[in-house]
Amino acid sequence: MLQFITIPNLMDYRVTLKLMEDYVNKVISDNELEVVYLVEHSEVYTAGTNYKQEELLNYGDIPVIYTGRGGKFTFHGPGQRVIYPILNLASPNRHKDLKLYIRMLEEWIINSLNYFGIKAYLIKDKVGIWVKVRKDEFAKIAAIGVRVRKWVTYHGVSINISTDLSKFRGIIPCGLENSLVTSLNQLGIHIEMSEFDKIIQNEFNKIFK
């Protein structure tokens, strides 16, 4: 059985990282139940294992944390829903296939956005979830960066709901120079975080049966 846990307050990224790592160890050693954490972070830039230092442009007083997830630099902050699925891909109802897992994450978020009338896309050689904002021009609305330890997943997905998009100017998001970033709010969708959470939980159950 899987449980969704919503953290009600802004959470420091370092605290979340320890929470994830501790829970991953429990799943590995004690066969603990799977969980999906729904988090909203205080402002932070995080760097994945493929980052380049020159992609950190002007971070000001926002902390920068170097993590073990895949990917490059991204921003987390208020108004962004960050989702951390801790799933055991070695369990009988899962598949020991990291590429398949990432495809399922992508499908999950695309379907969730579609519920709100947002047509989202995958773009070849560009990680994340994208929406068309102008003719032949796309903006990233969700970032993906995961890690797996002994087939247990952690880190995950961040979706911009009402995020302050100006903060992305402090980095080259995901190493994609001149790429645009958007949010549900910027696309004219104004919803409470709790409303979005209901949809992603419903859509999760369709993909990760």
Swiss-Prot record:
Its EC number is 2.3.1.181. One of its GO terms (molecular function) is lipoyl(octanoyl) transferase activity. Its main location: cytoplasm. It comes from the Bacteria. Substrate binds at residues 69-76, 143-145, 156-158. GO terms for biological process: protein modification process. It is an enzyme of class 2 (transferase). This is Octanoyltransferase. The lineage of its organism: Bacteria, Pseudomonadati, Pseudomonadota, Alphaproteobacteria, Rickettsiales. It catalyses: octanoyl-[ACP] + L-lysyl-[protein] = N(6)-octanoyl-L-lysyl-[protein] + holo-[ACP] + H(+). Catalyzes the transfer of endogenously produced octanoic acid from octanoyl-acyl-carrier-protein onto the lipoyl domains of lipoate-dependent enzymes. Lipoyl-ACP can also act as a substrate although octanoyl-ACP is likely to be the physiological substrate. In the reaction, the free carboxyl group of octanoic acid is attached via an amide linkage to the epsilon-amino group of a specific lysine residue of lipoyl domains of lipoate-dependent enzymes. Pfam families: LplA-B_cat. CDD domains: LipB. Belongs to the LipB family. The active site is at residue 174. InterPro entries: aa-tRNA-synth_II/BPL/LPL, BPL_LPL_catalytic, Octanoyltransferase, Octanoyltransferase_CS. The record marks 140 as: Lowers pKa of active site Cys. The gene is lipB. Residues 30-209 form the BPL/LPL catalytic domain. PANTHER family: LIPOYLTRANSFERASE 2, MITOCHONDRIAL-RELATED, OCTANOYLTRANSFERASE.
